[in-house]
């Protein structure tokens, strides 16, 4: 497992170690022990995942930008097991020097890359292939009453989603999220969300 730090502290790209031969390939998609050994020293704390989710979406589907409000905040470890997606984490912690900034990474069935999104970030993705199967691990259970989001179509975020706007396919809920300028974040850089 190779851990790549990004330009925003705590947001990580994870490359698994692949074993290939004439039959195909094998890799450990997740090892709690190795994740804790390699990621906890970077983050300054451990992360314990408790729920796995999977979605299937067609080209142009955009999901996000989602988060859960305190006290039900979530970290996520995501990957694309079929197809291709552009995955994005946006810093929405008040007082953060990178507030409103984002990290984008292409996750594909071929690169096997995983993306770690810490608490205090909004998360979303756009499907770039005909279909995509997307999996994610969460360190807190889903609480619908704590659902939150910011607009995935907010131009001020400067995200190039790599799909034409007229091909974007959003849920009704995701069309109603506030733009960043109108958003009152429930997160603060000075509050440790992992305590």
Describe these PLM feature segments:
Residues 1-110, 131, 138-195:
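Non-catalytic, conserved peripheral segments adjacent to functional cores
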Residues 107-131:
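Conserved metal-binding segment of the jelly-roll/cupin
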């Amino acid at each position: 497992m190779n851990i790549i730090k990004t330009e925003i502290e705590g947001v990580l790209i994870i490359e698994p170690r692949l074993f290939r031969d004439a039959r195909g390939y094998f890799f450990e998609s997740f090892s709690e022990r190795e994740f804790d050994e390699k990621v906890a020293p970077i983050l300054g704390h451990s992360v314990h995942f408790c729920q796995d989710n999977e979605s299937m979406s067609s080209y142009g589907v955009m999901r996000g930008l989602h988060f859960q409000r305190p006290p039900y905040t979530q970290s996520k470890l995501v990957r694309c097991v079929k197809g291709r997606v552009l995955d994005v984490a946006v810093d929405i912690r008040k007082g953060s020097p990178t507030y409103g900034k984002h990290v984008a990474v292409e996750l594909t069935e071929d690169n096997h890359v995983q993306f770690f999104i810490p608490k205090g970030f909004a998360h979303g993705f756009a499907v770039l292939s005909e279909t995509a199967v997307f999996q994610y691990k969460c360190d807190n259970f889903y609480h619908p009453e704590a659902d939150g989001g910011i607009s995935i179509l907010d131009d001020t975020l400067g995200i190039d989603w790599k799909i034409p706007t007229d091909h974007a396919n959003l849920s009704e809920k995701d069309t109603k999220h506030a733009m960043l300028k109108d958003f009152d974040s429930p997160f603060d850089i000075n509050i440790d969300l992992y305590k």
